[in-house]
Structure formats: C-alpha cells, structure tokens
Amino acid sequence: MSAAQISIEQSTIAAKAADEKLGTNIAVLDVSQVMGITDIFVVVSANNERQVAAIVDEVEAELTEAGLEPKRREGNREFRWVLLDYGDFVVHVQREQEREFYGLDRLYADCPVIAVEGIEPYQRPEEFTEVRGVEDLEDLPLAGEIPEDDD
C-alpha cells in the first residue's frame, strides 16, 4: 500500500508553500509502509528560527486556503522544529542543525520520495543504515551534533 493520492496532493501544497519561503532540501516521503498513523512526511530545512516561523506561516496559510487545518502543532514557541500534523500527512520544518541532529532523513531513508514539480529534487543522505533491518541497537545511526542556539 502506498500513500493515498489526496495525501500526495495536499502534501504537495505544503512543499510548494515551504519552497516559496526558501525552505531547502524539501523531502516529501511516503512513510505509509512504515507508519500506521500517517501517509507522508514533508521535511523542510530552514537557516534560523525566523525562517522556520515564516515557512510554517506560509504552509498553514496555503493549507487553510485549501480547506485544511492542522490537528496538532508542536514546537511553535522556539521555532527550531515545528511539526504540523494534518492527519494523513505531517509537515516537519526544522533548522538545519535540528534536521542533522534528529536525523529523520536517516530514519526514513528507505521510504519512497515523492517528486514535486517545480521544487529542486530532495538529496538523500549519502550514507544511511537500513534501520528496519538492524538486529542490534549499536548498529543504529547516531544522532548528529547537538544543535546550538541562534545568536
């Protein structure tokens, strides 16, 4: 089973909105095979908290215009990693440091990438571990460097 077409269409709106606010390395990942609660992750990088906030505002505005409201929001106090849960898809807007540290790209590197017309293709991490096939916890990839505060 793969992501529902409506989820793909709606997550594409989010990806394009993030691109409008200069979000980088935008990944639209079909996580439906490994997640029972959602079909798609949209993962976006931003340079700083201000840009995270701008991207989140644009994504919410575009999706609201399309008739969608998030079921849940997390992280919109510090704007380092904001999660917008729309049920069938989840938008993660992260500072580059948080994206590297928490490693969603590494955890879901085996999931299919959904191409979005007009957006630069997502670049997968060069090295990744097939995390669903490891037999020992020591074989799991470690997190990146601890993120620093924006000054």
For each feature predicted by the language model, list its residue ranges.
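A contiguous, mid-protein "functional segment" used to position or interact
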Residues: 86-121
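Intrinsically disordered, low-complexity charged/polar segments
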Residues: 122-151
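Short hydrophobic/aromatic beta-strand micro-patches
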Residues: 43-45, 94
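N-terminal first-folded block
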Residues: 8-39, 47
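N-terminal presequence-like segments and adjacent domain-start helices
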Residues: 1-7
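Compact, glycine-rich, soluble single-domain proteins
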Residues: 51-68, 83
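Glycine/charge-rich, flexible interdomain linkers and switch-proximal surface loops
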Residues: 25-37, 71-88
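Signal for well-folded cores of large energy- and translation-related assemblies
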Residues: 19, 23, 27, 60, ...
